[in-house]
């Protein structure tokens, strides 16, 4: 009977668990305005149409549309990243299923 009570208590606690993300904590995420950043040769800076797509597909589209972007990175959403601006980099923030969850942009 004690084991059953432990299992019930565990299930109740597990049902209340919520993963911690920046949005849940209401942390302001820095959005860089690359239109005024002075990145020469960058023809497209944002890809809102890639939200919800697989990361490999998004990476191919970005590199096809803008060959100067040589550093396309896949980053798990919520992972801390540097805030420096790089004109050859796009970060793809993905979930655990490897789908894009934030609008990819140069920076």
From Swiss-Prot:
Keyword terms, alphabetized: Protease inhibitor, Secreted, Serine protease inhibitor, Signal
GO cellular component entries: extracellular region
Domain of life: Eukaryota
GO molecular function: serine-type endopeptidase inhibitor activity
InterPro entries noted in UniProt: Prot_inh_pot1, Prot_inh_pot1_sf
Induction of expression: By tobacco mosaic virus infection, wounding, UV light, salicylic acid and ethylene.
Residue ranges of the propeptide: 23-39
Gene Ontology biological process terms in this record: response to wounding
Signal peptide from the UniProt entry: 1-22
Subcellular location: Secreted
Site features described as Reactive bond, chain residue numbers: 83-84
Coiled coil: none
Pfam families in alphabetical order: potato_inhibit
Membership in a protein family: Belongs to the protease inhibitor I13 (potato type I serine protease inhibitor) family.
PANTHER family: ETHYLENE-RESPONSIVE PROTEINASE INHIBITOR 1, PROTEIN, PUTATIVE, EXPRESSED-RELATED
This protein's name: Proteinase inhibitor I-B
Organism in which the protein naturally occurs: Nicotiana tabacum (Common tobacco)
Gene: TIMPA
């Amino acid at each position: 009977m004690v084991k059953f009570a432990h299992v019930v208590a565990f299930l109740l606690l597990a049902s209340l668990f919520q993963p911690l993300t920046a949005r849940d904590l209401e942390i302001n995420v820095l959005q860089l305005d690359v239109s005024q950043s002075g990145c020469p040769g960058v023809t497209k800076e944002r890809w809102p149409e890639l939200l919800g797509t697989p990361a490999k597909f998004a990476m191919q589209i970005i590199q096809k549309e803008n060959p100067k972007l040589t550093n396309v990175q896949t980053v798990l959403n919520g992972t801390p990243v540097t805030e420096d601006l790089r004109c050859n980099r796009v970060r793809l923030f993905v979930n655990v299923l490897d789908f894009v969850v934030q609008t990819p942009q140069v920076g």
